[in-house]
């Protein structure tokens, strides 16, 4: 618990400073530390009693041997050489006993860690491949969602009887209010979760009948929450294709409009990004994630608010690159900025876990439904911002 508290405090140090909550974090740490000290005090008290008892026994053993042995030597019932030999034997016995006592504390600490490790290792993944699962090969990119319902638990249904077919090479945008089920739908396609009912297939193969690895190899995902490893920019981009050459990495960086930023850094592609990319801006982290997808070059793309952290200028720059990347690939785009998806082949509106509308940008505007309302609201806000 204390280690989690320290990690949380250090990871959120900027947030704590921004809200002037240093005192709150200090109080949380003091509480966690007090709990840690209480548990450790009981442990060390028990170990202290144990070590003291062992030492008392071992020291008493020598005293008893010398006392009784000396008495018997004086009485002539024992030869002094026998007493000396016996004392040496006992001394050789005492040293291993001390080591065993010291080992017991190390063992107690290690055993607690081992129990936690075994508990994690014995946890079975909720999504598993079938014994006879096939490999997904030569993917064209047809996605079929057939009467899919999904709930994270029995009381929290997210999707209700959703059906959708995406043709190979088609670009489909998914919009709707927050919490409507857009991201959940896109997490079901790579089989991060199993559907509660219905089925999802890629190229007419149910994703439950193919290996998860082959699914993930053919799908590229850029999410809102970008995760970067504590490594260099080069290795973070190369994560999309571990055997990529430096030339391929540079090309991907250029397409993602991050190359100039990298070149401006003192160490270029060898720049260390810090834990979770803390040394980079939000836009830079997102563009590195986009560069990974350019490098991976999959037949299916899922862009979950992929440009949410980009400014308007940079977003406009990479929009053309996205159009080139999406050409000939099946692409699903989750977007709140509706201006970025006007050119999608189809736009689907999801609200409360149900598909409410489907059509092109112009068709949905003419319908005057949820999409039209969202579009008008965003336009009004944009005009208001310009007026100010």
Question: Which role does the model predict for each range below?
Answer:
Residues 1-8, 14-63, 106-109, 125-126, ...:
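An intracellular "coupling" helix at the cytosolic face of ABC transporter transmembrane type-1 domains
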Residues 42-115, 120-121:
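Helix-loop-helix
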Residues 18-21, 41-45, 49, 76, ...:
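Residue-level signature of the cytosolic catalytic core of signaling kinases
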Residues 16, 117, 251-253:
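Helix-loop junctions and hydrophobic alpha-helical segments within the transmembrane domains
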Residues 4, 11, 15-18, 31, ...:
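Regular, well-ordered alpha-helical segments
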Residues 1, 8, 59, 99, ...:
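HisKA/DHp dimerization-phosphotransfer core of two-component histidine kinases
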Residues 29, 117, 145-147:
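Conserved catalytic Walker-motif region of ABC-type ATPase nucleotide-binding domains
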Residues 129-130, 134-388:
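ABC-type nucleotide-binding domain
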